[in-house]
Amino acid sequence: MSVANSRTAVYPGTFDPITNGHIDLVNRAAPLFERVVVGVAYSPSKGPALSLERRVALAQEALAAHANVEVRGFDTLLAHFVRQMGAGVLLRGLRAVSDFEYEFQMASMNRHLIPEVETLFLTPSEQYSFISSSLVREIARLGGDVSGFVPASVVEALRQVRESRAQA
């Protein structure tokens, strides 16, 4: 087990897909920590549109400009992943009041599971406060333009998913 380091933060999520809101949060967190680990959760129960490997690759591409940011997939309990990474901070984004109740419950549970780790909430920049991966997936599934919400590589990945489902 690693010792918690307050200079290392884990930003977990499904990132199905990574959005400009996620990227904004990492852009703002990267200068605050020596190391930021973006933990891409396997989450098969959520029925992700993109495979874990694809989500990791898209996040790596989107965040490549940061030398202190690494992207890792994980399929364990978040508390175990955070300890494995030696992190002392768990980053979470809060878009709206509607996110707060869920995030508060998760932070409380994580405090019991990993008491040595603090949860830090960051709010998005205003232009990203309405973006969610689920909305992006739904717009893309229905053939809408998501280019204002995600990087070009994600637009292409979602187009490929839509085409493969149309052929199935």
Curated annotation (Swiss-Prot):
UniProt binding sites for ATP: T14, F15, H22, G93, L94, R95, E103, Y128, S129, F130, I131, S132, S133, S134
Chemical reaction(s) catalysed: (R)-4'-phosphopantetheine + ATP + H(+) = 3'-dephospho-CoA + diphosphate
Signal peptide span: none
Keyword check for Metal-binding: no
Pathway note: Cofactor biosynthesis; coenzyme A biosynthesis; CoA from (R)-pantothenate: step 4/5
Matches recorded under Pfam families: CTP_transf_like (PF01467)
Subcellular location(s) per record: Cytoplasm
GO molecular function per UniProt: ATP binding; pantetheine-phosphate adenylyltransferase activity
Site (Transition state stabilizer): H22
Gene Ontology cellular-component terms listed: cytoplasm
Binding site for substrate: T14, K46, L78, R92
Keywords assigned by UniProt, alphabetized: ATP-binding, Coenzyme A biosynthesis, Cytoplasm, Magnesium, Nucleotide-binding, Nucleotidyltransferase, Transferase
This protein's record includes keyword Mitochondrion: no
InterPro entries assigned: Cyt_trans-like, PPAT, Rossmann-like_a/b/a_fold
Cofactor: Mg(2+)
Catalytic class of the enzyme: transferase
Primary localization: cytoplasm
One BP term from GO: coenzyme A biosynthetic process
E.C. designation(s): 2.7.7.3
Protein's job: Reversibly transfers an adenylyl group from ATP to 4'-phosphopantetheine, yielding dephospho-CoA (dPCoA) and pyrophosphate.
Family the entry assigns: Belongs to the bacterial CoaD family.
Assembly description: Homohexamer.
Protein name as catalogued: Phosphopantetheine adenylyltransferase
